[in-house]
Amino acid sequence: MKKLITANDIRAAHARGEQAMSVVLRASIITPEAREVAELLGFTITECDESVPASTSAQACKSESQRIREAIIAQLPEGQFTESLVAQLMEKVLKEKQSLELGTMQPSFTSVTGKGGVKVIDGSSVKFGRFDGAEPHCVGLTDLVTEQDGSSMAAGFMQWDNAFFPWTLNYDEIDMVLEGELHVRHEGETMIAKAGDVMFIPKGSSIEFGTPTSVRFLYVAWPANWQSV
């Protein structure tokens, strides 16, 4: 079984003072959010084959996060800031940038469909569009499997940070949380699903979707035209 490398794994390693992590490609799955957090913290993820020794000597051009980091440090009083403060400010800047981009970005992804209709989506290629049903909150949504694939079900990714919004489901939905935690408020109680958990929401439910932190999950809905029923 492959090991799932999540954003929390990166944060924990960084908190321990580590600056890099080596993973074996064939035995690991690195989530997109883990890569984003690693870039944010200046943390290096080295991907290697089992037969190749881990190396952290790769030198690359300055990434966007490094440029943001340098700009932030340049505006802070010399010697009067901590790495934790810099990380918090970087996260704020990148989230604001992501929110602006999300407002104009069209959802997209790379996939391959076989002759018999079997479809494989490259999870790392997924770019989010904005879910209109959650305005004014910036909620990302990308449909990956739709009626156009000849499917009676739909599937896709959703993600957002620190927001709650009402929604009524005229369809059945199953959600598998990939990152963070998903809160669903319904009939006076709050159900919480964390990374690795699966949640079922029956048709006809009037709920409040949300998270006090951040969440990214895979949804499967029936029927496939869930947005128009």
Swiss-Prot record:
* Keyword ATP-binding belongs to the record: yes
**What EC number(s) does the entry state?**
2.7.2.1
| Keywords, sorted A to Z | ATP-binding, Bacterial microcompartment, Kinase, Nucleotide-binding, Transferase, Virulence
Please name the top-level EC class of this enzyme: transferase
Practical applications: Artificial BMCs can be made in E.coli by expressing eutK, eutL, eutM, eutN, eutS (eutSMNLK). Cargo proteins can be targeted to them. The addition of eutQ to the eutSMNLK construct results in biogenesis of multiple BMCs. This can lead to the development of tailored BMCs for specific metabolic reactions.
* Coiled-coil annotated spans: none
Q: Where is this region: Required for interaction with EutM?
A: 1-100
Q: What does the function comment of this entry state?
A: A bidirectional acetate kinase that may drive flux through the ethanolamine (EA) degradation pathway under anoxic conditions found when this bacteria infects the host intestine. It may generate ATP that can be used by other enzymes (EutA and EutT) in the eut pathway. Can use GTP instead of ATP with reduced efficiency. Might be required to correctly target EutE to bacterial microcompartments (BMC). Required for the biogenesis of multiple mobile BMCs per cell. Might serve as an assembly hub for BMC shell proteins. Expression of the eut operon allows this bacteria to use ethanolamine (EA) as a carbon, nitrogen and energy source. It relies on cobalamin (vitamin B12) both as a cofactor for the ethanolamine ammonia-lyase (EAL) activity and to induce the operon. EA enhances bacterial survival in macrophages in a concentration-dependent manner, suggesting it is an important nutrient during infection.
Question: What is the protein's given name?
Answer: Acetate kinase EutQ
Phylogenetic lineage: Bacteria, Pseudomonadati, Pseudomonadota, Gammaproteobacteria, Enterobacterales
